[in-house]
A protein has these predicted regions:
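Charged, low-complexity intrinsically disordered terminal segments
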Residues: 2-134, 142-156, 160-408
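A short acidic/basic microdomain associated with nuclease active sites
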Residues: 138
Length: 408
């Protein structure tokens, strides 16, 4: 009897592995054909240098309180998109607020990525539309490039209220982003509130994304052009080499230090990686702060090979200890600060639609540097033994992660 059960188990395992391999090969072929066709090729939107007042939020509760407060005060319109939304108390409060503002006569446009928004129930969508909210999914799967279209996600998180206030960063909607999921614990992230000239660029990008994904018309408003104190520039990426060129170009300018903050460290991009290696050869101190504790599968194991390479090059790697670190940023010589939606991984570098804010204002950077320093202090420096002396289970997971690292 046991032999029969064992035989059935081995057969099922063989079938499962076979199906996975077929899907993987099909996905690779589909992605390659799609890339050659240019189906997902778009030039990035590089906006002019602007002057805005910028506030960075690292705590989900504080961000939610401010964002919800700004939405409640909206008089004319709300444009808002997130990569994902949960199905919990926090998300229900958010959706109720959008419906309420629509009923008050405010034009509400809400979008969520099709895969990231998979937990958004049909009844919630229907109630949004019933209450007058304009709703669409971003990047719905399409034929004939089904696998490739599933890969290309809209990872931007743009909010615009009355053309006066904008938001962009790493937070999504759900209680885990407030640190209220016991399994994940404290959630640390970076999200910007923008007041000033830069709001018009966030609104313009939202309108571009909306028109790309929906036939429902969306008006173009006259966002505020009042100048703030901080000099910055937005760039929206649709995937491809431009992001790598931007990062490499900035890293090549480094003279003293580069600090990278990322939840995932899977830098499978030769242009970016070579720029970091060259920086080390010039004597630039390179620090990488990532999150070993994560809400995503296999990303820690996928990072191991790159951590080993980084350590061999003399880079310093730190693992955040206080929960989940989901912020996306880098700081170069305390002269250039990037905060945005781009993770340091292949998905953000090559597949996702992303948006970054590049800040060149020394006064503002001097205020954010201590925030990053605190996160480094709340981290453990990774040594070679940490990534070389792995258990058998971790070694197996690393091998599996290596196969799928491009998509993680």
């Amino acid at each position: 009897m046991l032999k029969k059960i064992g035989k059935i188990f081995r057969l099922l395992l063989f079938v499962f592995i076979g199906i996975c391999l077929v899907l993987f090969v099909w996905g690779e072929i589909d992605r390659t054909v799609a890339e050659k066709s240019g189906r997902f090729a778009h030039q990035p939107s590089q906006y002019p240098i602007r002057q805005s007042d910028i506030t960075m939020y690292t705590d989900g509760k504080q961000l939610n309180n401010q964002l919800f407060s700004d939405i409640k005060k909206a008089k004319d319109y709300v444009h808002i998109s997130f990569f994902s939304i949960a199905d919990d108390k926090v998300s229900h409060q958010f959706l109720d607020l959008l419906r309420q503002k629509s009923q008050e006569g405010v034009e509400v446009y809400y979008a969520v990525d099709r895969l990231g928004g998979i937990l958004l129930k049909k009844k919630e969508r229907e109630l949004l539309v019933k209450k007058g909210v304009h709703f669409t999914y971003y990047n719905k799967p399409v034929f004939p490039y089904l696998s490739a279209s599933l890969d290309h996600r809209n990872h931007r998180r743009i909010s615009v209220i009355d053309g006066r206030i904008g938001y962009i960063g790493g937070f999504n909607i759900g209680k885990k982003y407030l640190g209220e999921k016991a399994k994940l614990g404290h959630w640390r992230d970076y999200h910007l509130q923008i007041r000033g000239e830069g709001v018009q660029d966030l609104e313009n990008q939202f309108v571009l994304d909306w028109k790309k994904n929906s036939e429902k018309p969306i008006p173009i408003h006259s966002a505020t052009k009042e100048k703030g104190k901080t000099s910055h520039r937005f760039t929206a990426y649709y995937s491809g080499e431009k992001l790598g060129q931007d990062y490499a170009g900035l890293f090549q300018q480094a003279k003293e230090s580069i600090i990278i903050v990322t939840p995932y460290f899977i830098p499978k991009d030769k242009t970016i990686w070579n720029a970091l290696v060259d920086a080390r050869k010039r004597g630039v101190r390179v620090k990488i702060l990532f999150s070993p504790h994560s809400d995503a599968l296999l990303v820690k194991e996928a990072a191991y090979p790159y951590i080993r390479k980084a350590l061999k090059q003399g880079m310093e790697v730190y693992g955040y200890k206080e929960g989940v670190l989901h912020g996306k940023a880098f700081l170069i010589d305390e002269n250039v600060l990037m905060v945005g939606t781009v993770n340091f991984d292949s998905r953000s570098f090559h597949l996702n639609e992303e948006m970054n804010c590049y800040i060149h204002d020394p006064v503002y950077i001097s205020k954010i540097k201590p925030v990053i320093d605190v996160d480094l202090q709340n981290s453990k420096r990774v040594t070679s033994s940490d990534v070389n002396q792995l258990s058998i289970k971790e070694k197996v997971k690393e091998k599996v992660a290596k196969i799928f690292e491009y998509y993680l």
